[in-house]
């Protein structure tokens, strides 16, 4: 059922699939070659450079993309990149044609790509953000991502704290923002130590010409340096709860059993909002590091001291699920991140439709987005 053919075939096909237990989402998902995670994360359809740009990479991963077979006209760009000195890796469950063109071949069990990407991310965050922070990575996260933005932490009836939503200017009475304060996010500015309304959120898109951009300025045009972490400027450490789905049984892989809710400690600030209530807030960056189980010295459980710990997110944990040796995960993650650091981002991933042929395929793709 394709809408572009006729609404009759689309409607009847959708009805049939629903009756046999299928789940119909958006047309974006039907082809399974365009990842739904892209508009979920960025609000835009997949927008990538042309294949000729592979030549400019210095580390190239073909993940679920059998380039010689499914992208035959582009295959020569892949080979030419190798002649240019680019290191290549294939990640496919089978020894496909692309695996013959690469320096390394990783073969995770079908459907376990998210666990593999999660472990890659754990290594990258630990070594290039915590142990020896990369100035290039942290500056990139500060300017081009939502990682400095503040998130409200909601206390549940059982006493647990969970991430709720972004803190908005409207939560604090507008902070002088007359235009769409309910759509403007907040962060702390290292220059002043105060809350700032940084450019770039959707609240700037309409009504304020020239301000919908990611220049490192606040809404008044003052230069900012957004604070990524509250580690050195907080009102305390709080245990925040994160869901865990790796224990779900499946015939294709081994479940890694842990509690369905994992608590991890992160630094927080306490703010009194316009309604008089006090809320704890944390940065996206701190929440992300906690989600990946990276130990930052805040105490508490459910964090990994080393890569061999059987803790969600570690190379050892993913080995149980994917079957990929932990040593290979550590090596590829280090090389991928080190190359990106030294070349200012010239590590690339070619993602194929094989990543999208799964329910919850957006989780596969989000893991890769975080790596990049």
Language model features with spans:
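Long, well-ordered, tryptophan-enriched scaffold segments
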Residues: 99-100, 104-342
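Anionic-ligand anchoring segments at beta-strand to alpha-helix junctions in alpha/beta enzyme folds, i.e.
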Residues: 2-56
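A short helix->loop->beta-strand "cap" motif at the edges of active sites that frequently abuts
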Residues: 80-88
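Glycine/threonine-rich flexible loop motifs
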Residues: 67-78
């Amino acid at each position: 059922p394709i809408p572009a053919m006729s609404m009759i075939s689309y409607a009847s096909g959708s009805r049939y699939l629903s009756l046999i237990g299928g789940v119909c989402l958006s047309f974006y998902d039907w082809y399974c070659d365009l990842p739904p995670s892209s508009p979920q994360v960025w609000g835009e359809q997949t927008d990538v450079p042309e294949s000729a740009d592979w030549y400019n990479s210095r580390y190239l991963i073909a993940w679920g993309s059998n380039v010689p077979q499914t992208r035959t006209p582009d295959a020569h760009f892949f080979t030419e990149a190798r002649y240019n000195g680019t290191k290549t890796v294939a990640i496919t469950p089978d020894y496909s044609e692309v695996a013959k063109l690469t320096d390394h071949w990783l073969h995770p069990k079908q459907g376990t790509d998210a666990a593999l990407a999660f472990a890659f991310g754990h290594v990258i965050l630990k070594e290039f953000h915590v142990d020896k922070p990369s100035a290039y990575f942290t500056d990139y996260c500060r300017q081009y991502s939502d990682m400095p933005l503040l998130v409200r932490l909601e206390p549940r009836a059982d006493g647990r704290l969970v991430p709720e939503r972004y803190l908005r200017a409207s939560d604090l009475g507008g902070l002088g923002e007359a235009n769409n304060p309910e759509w403007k996010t907040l962060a702390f500015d290292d220059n002043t130590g105060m809350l700032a309304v940084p450019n770039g959120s959707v609240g700037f898109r309409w009504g304020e010409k020239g301000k919908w951009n990611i220049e490192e300025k606040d809404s008044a045009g003052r230069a900012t340096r957004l604070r990524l972490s509250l580690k050195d400027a907080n009102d305390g450490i709080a245990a925040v709860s994160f869901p865990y789905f790796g224990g779900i049984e499946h015939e294709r892989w081994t479940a890694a059993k842990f509690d369905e809710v994992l608590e991890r400690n992160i630094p927080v600030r306490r703010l009194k909002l316009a309604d008089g209530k006090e809320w704890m807030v944390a940065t996206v960056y701190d929440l992300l590091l906690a989600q990946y189980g990276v130990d930052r010295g805040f105490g508490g459980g459910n964090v990994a001291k080393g890569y061999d710990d059987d803790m969600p997110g570690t190379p050892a944990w993913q080995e149980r699920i994917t079957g990929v040796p932990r040593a290979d995960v550590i090596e590829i993650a280090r090389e991928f991140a080190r190359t990106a650091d030294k070349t200012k981002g010239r590590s690339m991933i070619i993602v194929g439709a094989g990543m999208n042929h799964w329910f919850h395929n957006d989780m596969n793709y989000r893991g890769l987005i975080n790596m990049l």
